[in-house]
Amino acid sequence: MSDNDTIVAQATPPGRGGVGILRISGLKAREVAETVLGKLPKPRYADYLPFKDADGSVLDQGIALWFPGPNSFTGEDVLELQGHGGPVILDLLLKRILTIPGLRIARPGEFSERAFLNDKLDLAQAEAIADLIDASSEQAARSALNSLQGAFSARVNHLVEALTHLRIYVEAAIDFPDEEIDFLSDGKIEAQLNDVIADLDAVRAEARQGSLLREGMKVVIAGRPNAGKSSLLNALAGREAAIVTDIAGTTRDVLREHIHIDGMPLHIIDTAGLREASDEVERIGIERAWQEIEQADRVLFMVDGTTTDAVDPAEIWPEFIARLPAKLPITVVRNKADITGETLGMSELNGHALIRLSARTGEGVDVLRNHLKQSMGFDTNMEGGFLARRRHLQALEQAAEHLQQGKAQLLGAWAGELLAEELRLAQQNLSEITGEFTSDDLLGRIFSSFCIGK
């Protein structure tokens, strides 16, 4: 297998459909056109032609599109054949194309990888293709499209350019210490560094929003049996996703629902009631519940308001609180306010949010929705924006750390060499986002997660 091979893959989903598309990219795309179509179509024009087998018989008839390199998606010669979407027809056509020497089936994401390697896309834009396909909401799709069109990359490149300019001044001061202007001590470097830090903080804030749009928030509903966990899941989902009865221990396994709150994806997980298990099935369910709790972004600690007047989680169930991960955020949800007569709404207690509601009637559930949105810092009024992955956030955080360390070197010891090194490392972190500085291993992991025909 070589990167110089001509590759072919189905670009439409497998199965039956009105249209099926095969995409070919590489040096032999021209030969495929001449062999299967009998001619080379006019560049970038739709040509209605028969698709022929080796014996001259017609396999299908459809649209052929020819994009000679470098003016194509991959930067190579690209041919697209758009025929009927039957799996048998597409399979026959694919087998016909693969009889031509030098062609092979594309790896997942290989078309996008070639576009990146041929400077048609940077890495953030290439990732945005997969994110656009996987978008679960309108806002996520729009943000992915912004990333594909270069919005995120432009912000990152602006930061890289600013750091390059800053490094020039710092390294000039190091290399020419006898010059009249001392760049390190006249305040210019500090002012420029502060500007870059402020710009980076703004990008980090937008990236966190973009990460929420892409990844969503994992919320686990946990508590004792019959506290109303499944009723709350149904109320948040807006449908009867879970069976609700008065029998304690009805929920034996993990139930998952994916919803959106004003565009923010929310992964809600209902778990088995936590208690001493009465049988092996319940024990396994409780064990899975704890596994989900430990991986949550937030836990909704469900409390049956008819069984206790306590509001402090450590007082309600100290053993449960003691077992939770130290930094895991908790929201105490006192349920059954329709029975207890408690005032609906939210308050703060010892660093925890406390919400009183009725999962059965739905009263107070909107307060919980708003709380979940605000607790993650999600901005529904965000204009534009872009999607961000975990690796993007990590690179931005590392760059911010290096800039803060560089600032400390500047203000503390005026150590120009150490400042220059911190600036270089920050620049390297940012360049990893767009692929200007990226390991082959990372590229392999990123593109292998794409669809076959992308």
UniProtKB/Swiss-Prot annotation:
Record-listed E.C. numbers: 3.6.-.-
A single MF term (Gene Ontology): GTP binding
Binding, Mg(2+): S230, T251
Every TrmE-type G domain range: 216-377
Free-text cofactor note: Binds 1 potassium ion per subunit.
Family annotation (PROSITE patterns): G_TRME
InterPro entries named among the record's database cross-references: G_TrmE (IPR031168), GTP-bd (IPR006073), GTP-bd_TrmE_N (IPR018948), GTPase_MnmE (IPR004520), MnmE_dom2 (IPR027368), MnmE_helical (IPR025867), P-loop_NTPase (IPR027417), Small_GTP-bd (IPR005225)
Keywords, ordered alphabetically: Cytoplasm, GTP-binding, Hydrolase, Magnesium, Metal-binding, Nucleotide-binding, Potassium, tRNA processing
Names of the cofactor(s): K(+)
GO cellular component: cytosol
Pfam families in alphabetical order: MMR_HSR1, MnmE_helical, TrmE_N
Binding site for K(+): N226, T245, I247, T250
Family the entry assigns: Belongs to the TRAFAC class TrmE-Era-EngA-EngB-Septin-like GTPase superfamily. TrmE GTPase family.
Function field: Exhibits a very high intrinsic GTPase hydrolysis rate. Involved in the addition of a carboxymethylaminomethyl (cmnm) group at the wobble position (U34) of certain tRNAs, forming tRNA-cmnm(5)s(2)U34.
Protein name: tRNA modification GTPase MnmE
